[in-house]
UniProtKB/Swiss-Prot annotation:
Residues 414-429 have a biased composition (Basic and acidic residues). It comes from Yarrowia lipolytica (strain CLIB 122 / E 150). The keyword Cell inner membrane does not apply. It is a peripheral membrane protein. Serine/threonine protein kinase involved in the cytoplasm to vacuole transport (Cvt) and found to be essential in autophagy, where it is required for the formation of autophagosomes. Involved in the clearance of protein aggregates which cannot be efficiently cleared by the proteasome. Required for selective autophagic degradation of the nucleus (nucleophagy) as well as for mitophagy which contributes to regulate mitochondrial quantity and quality by eliminating the mitochondria to a basal level to fulfill cellular energy requirements and preventing excess ROS production. This is Serine/threonine-protein kinase ATG1. Residues 7-299 form the Protein kinase domain. PANTHER family: NON-SPECIFIC SERINE_THREONINE PROTEIN KINASE, SERINE/THREONINE-PROTEIN KINASE UNC-51-RELATED. It is found in: Cytoplasm; Preautophagosomal structure membrane. Homodimer. Forms a ternary complex with ATG13 and ATG17.
Length: 710
């Protein structure tokens, strides 16, 4: 048994992506505690900020219905948050396992006998009790101008009931004294939000997330009220009010409901139905405010109500965790960070070829990490198929080698072209904002076209074609794009090849060549944005020989390696697409001995270099991937990171860092545009629409930003 100062660390209670919670014990008093241990090496700047926010907020929290932070300790490898121990687990576990618990724990059995339910949910009196306690905590947060932003059943923890009505009154508890005590936990996403303020961040759990957040609109503390409505509905009915496989379907389901909320064959009281419906209004302006909320008949009386009879506390050991009352084989581990909840964590074990993958979504279709690359069909570049026997880069598969040979052959042929046959460039190329013929200007042009519903004519390489007229929307500010800085927080970034892909020269090539050059630049920019994300993950799993204790655990390293591998495969797919198009154009024009610009050659050489390095790194990270079912897709990784970058950009914009936020906005647009490239295993129509919607939303912010700088 390990320990930290004043505490011993016992069995694991639950595990998430960034933290593990253990049952602990205070050495001097023997009191049980929960110890949330966070591995330092897994935290980037944003996660450190969230952890710091949680700690600072919890230090202020002294309320009977808020989980208390008892102590905070740091070691060279971990942060340890010593929390109040809630032995009955979380509300989600209780709802799902109440039948099994009633068979092994008399407390739960007597509770359900006293308050039987005709639905998969809970008896209405029990729901009211929990809602009273949740509302008391919410009112406390409101007084401190705090919005939780992640209210969900997994963050509502339960403790055994008070021993007496007097004890409940002395502790200032709400609800019925003889029933379990509910407490709000996990303030990692919480923030100070004055009543007049609006936030622009997307966080929390989608199934309980307000639609204004799903729509990536500004929101205020009313978002918490939606979450309370969703949680209350689940307690009453036994399932969330809206279910979906991804963000797209979830938002679509909410919007199509038109605020019509059904409760099934066993509806609760009219008051309860009205309460939930007042909260689950898709338009926040139609949703009740906090004044009306606290005045609603369901909430009005939150004080302790004595029903007189204590529940059966026999066999209840305050030191035992709820899971210990059920056979271990039947118990899944408590998941601490279900930000995507059930729809984003679905596992797909069905094996199918890409040709059958017509409805792949951003988050629900999960590929096996054991992949191989198959011969690309026209226009589809590298396609992925599932294969249990081998990893996709095993040496016996000659497809990748064949693609590498083809890429290098074309690049070598162009490299041998005499310099005198190429028009010279007046300057070296860099990926900049403001240049009317630049790739960034066309990114804004593409996004603006989506925003206005216009169609752009392109070379047919995918749905993300840019403007071919070279006009763009450049303001001439010349602010240099640093996607690496936006991704990694450094002052300057490096691409897969250590430099930016080239962008147009000041000389104007012939129309046909200009078209192919612009097409290649766009694909290169998309590939570069994905490669940068892969490179960040690549750097995270490099072993530190001098400090082996700082290396990530194998399971964590394998997971990150798997993500890097998927991203490098996506990068290779885009780069291969670029070379396919370049090769086709070169074949048609070289026979006429037409002169080509040096810029055409430069972008081919950059693409070749990026392809080779991405392939090499993919082979490296592949060695760290353990066998088993993958937990994500490249599409989801790219989608999530693009939204995270745009959210960070909004924060930078508020702080006045216009160059930094412009970089983040434009890079996120490129990443989302990369998702729209057509291939046989591409996005479904619904997913394409949601990606286009986010591109339009981010473009609005970018246009406003540039307007402010002019």
């Amino acid at each position: 048994m390990s320990s930290i100062k004043s505490y011993t660390i016992g069995n694991e209670l639950g595990r998430g992506s960034f933290a593990t919670v253990y049952k602990g014990e205070h050495v001097a008093s023997g009191s049980p505690v929960a110890i949330k241990s966070v591995l330092r090496a897994k935290l980037n700047r944003k996660l450190l900020e969230n952890l710091g926010s949680e700690i600072s907020i919890l230090k202020q929290m002294k309320h009977p219905h808020v989980v208390e932070l008892l102590d905070f300790q740091e070691t060279p490898t971990h942060f340890h948050l010593v929390m109040e121990y809630c032995s009955l687990g979380d509300l989600s576990f209780f709802l799902k396992k109440k039948k099994e618990l009633s068979e092994t724990l008399p407390l739960v059995a007597s509770l359900l006998r006293r308050y039987p339910s005709n639905t998969r949910g809970l008896h209405e009196e029990l729901v009211r009790h929990f809602v009273h306690q949740l509302s008391a905590a919410l009112e406390f947060l409101r007084q401190k101008n705090l919005v939780h932003r992640d209210i969900k059943p997994q963050n509502l923890l339960l403790c055994p009931p008070s021993l007496s009505e007097m004890d409940a009154q002395n502790a200032n508890l709400y609800g019925r004294w003889e029933l379990p005590i509910l407490k709000i936990a996990d303030f990692g996403f919480a923030r100070i939000l004055p009543a007049s303020a609006l936030a622009e961040t997307l966080c929390g759990s989608p199934l309980y997330m307000a639609p204004e957040i799903l729509r990536y609109e500004k929101y205020n503390a009313k978002a918490d009220l939606w979450s309370v409505g969703a949680v209350t509905y689940e307690m009453v009915v036994g399932k969330p009010p809206f279910k979906a496989n991804n963000y797209v379907e979830l938002l679509k389901t909410i919007e199509q409901s038109n605020d019509v909320i059904g409760f099934g064959r066993e509806p609760p009281s009219e008051d309860m139905q009205d309460f939930v419906r007042c909260l689950l209004k898709k338009n926040p302006a139609d949703r009740i405010g906090f004044k009306e909320y606290f005045e609603h008949p369901i909430i009005a009386n939150k004080q302790v109500i004595g029903s007189g009879e204590e529940l059966d506390r026999s066999q209840l050991d305050p030191r035992m965790y709820i899971s210990e009352y059920i056979q271990e084989a039947d118990l899944p581990k408590l998941d601490l960070d279900r930000e995507m909840d059930s729809f984003s964590q679905k596992r797909s074990t069905q094996k199918s070829s890409p040709k059958n993958s017509t409805n792949k979504t951003l988050s629900s279709t999960v590929k096996n990490p054991l992949l191989e690359l198959t011969s690309p069909s026209p226009g589809s570049s590298l396609l992925l198929t599932r294969k249990n026997e081998s990893l996709f880069l095993e040496s016996e598969y000659v497809v990748v080698e064949k693609r590498q040979v083809e890429v290098n052959t074309l690049a070598d042929e162009l490299a041998r072209e005499p310099d005198e046959r190429r028009p010279s460039s007046e300057r070296r190329f860099s990926l900049t904002y403001g240049a009317p013929t630049g790739a960034m200007a066309r990114a804004l042009s593409m996004a603006s076209a989506r925003l206005l519903g216009e169609k752009k004519n392109g070379a047919g390489h995918g749905s993300g074609n840019g403007s071919r007229n070279g006009s763009g929307n450049g303001s001439g500010n010349g602010a240099r794009l640093s996607a690496g800085a936006a991704l990694s927080g450094t002052s300057s970034g490096t691409s897969t090849t250590g430099k930016s892909p080239p962008v147009p020269a000041t000389t104007t090539p012939s129309l046909s060549e200009r078209e192919i050059v612009e097409t290649l630049e766009e694909i290169a920019a998309k590939a570069r944005s994905i490669a940068l994300l892969a490179d960040v993950k690549y750097s995270q799993i490099q072993d530190d020989v001098d400090n082996p204790d700082m290396n990530l655990p194998d399971s964590v390293s394998s997971s990150i390696a798997e993500e890097a591998m998927l991203l490098y495969v996506k990068t290779l797919s885009l780069l291969s697409l670029a070379m396919d198009q370049a090769g086709a154009w070169w074949s048609n024009n070289h026979k006429d001995n037409k002169m080509v610009s040096s810029h055409f050659n430069e972008i081919i050489q950059w693409t070749r270099s990026a392809f080779n390095e991405s392939l090499e790194r993919a082979e490296t990270v592949k060695k760290k991937v353990s066998s088993g079912t993958t937990h994500t897709t490249a599409e989801k990784l790219i989608f999530d990171r693009a939204l995270e970058m745009s959210r960070d950009a909004a924060v930078q914009e508020i702080s006045g860092d216009f160059t930094g936020c412009e970089s983040a906005y434009t890079t996120s647009i490129w990443m989302l545009e990369a998702l729209l490239e057509d291939d046989e295993d591409g996005l479904g129509e619904e997913d394409r629409r949601i990606v286009e919607r986010f591109i339009s939303s981010i473009t609005k912010r970018l246009v406003i930003l540039r307007g402010q700088q002019e």
